[in-house]
């Protein structure tokens, strides 16, 4: 029972719509009505400006980061292979990612899970996140597309999990990569059409 409560709590925390709340609270804007219509960090930078964008990014990363430690903090004990699987920090973090993408508070229309996924990886393997961040910014510097950099970093996470032989991370990163590609399908189409906005600060 405690495992179910923990996973539900992780989902609900992940579902907290940082961009939407910051937009409404400080700018009286529904961020979903501007830019890409997304509630995540990238659209927050675009619509609300850099300070708000950084705040939303921090909050979204933090959501994923703290949920990784729920099994430890809540002292949830596993007594079998199934319960052991669902008390793994990565699996608990996955529920936060799903909450971010499909938030119950906003009729299941959320962000694209990049920052929250980064928070989960930060909690599990900071060195891997550092490597992925370097890859992200290299791709971003070259191509100027946040969406492309995010997808490449996610795929590299899958490859990295194979290299370090972390098979739960492999499962989670593969699922997240699929989610990211699906959530970025309109961005991918715009890139091929040459219509995807490029960043101007790098």
Swiss-Prot record:
Name the Gene Ontology molecular function terms of this record: acyl-phosphate glycerol-3-phosphate acyltransferase activity
The main place the protein resides is membrane
Spell out the GO cellular component terms annotated for this protein, sorted alphabetically and separated by semicolons: plasma membrane
Q: Is this entry keyworded Membrane?
A: yes
Residue ranges crossing the lipid bilayer per the database entry: 2-22, 54-74, 85-105, 120-140, 141-161, 162-182
**What reaction is this protein's catalytic activity?**
an acyl phosphate + sn-glycerol 3-phosphate = a 1-acyl-sn-glycero-3-phosphate + phosphate
Q: What membrane topology does the UniProt entry give?
A: Multi-pass membrane protein
Listed pathway(s): Lipid metabolism; phospholipid metabolism
Under Enzyme Commission nomenclature, its number is 2.3.1.275
Give the subcellular location.
Cell membrane
Name the top EC class.
Answer: transferase
Reading the lineage from the top rank, the first entry is Bacteria
The protein's matches in NCBIfam families, at most eight in alphabetical order, are given as: glycerol-3-phosphate 1-O-acyltransferase PlsY (TIGR00023)
The record's section on HAMAP family has: PlsY
This protein's assembly is summarised as: Probably interacts with PlsX.
The protein, known as: Glycerol-3-phosphate acyltransferase
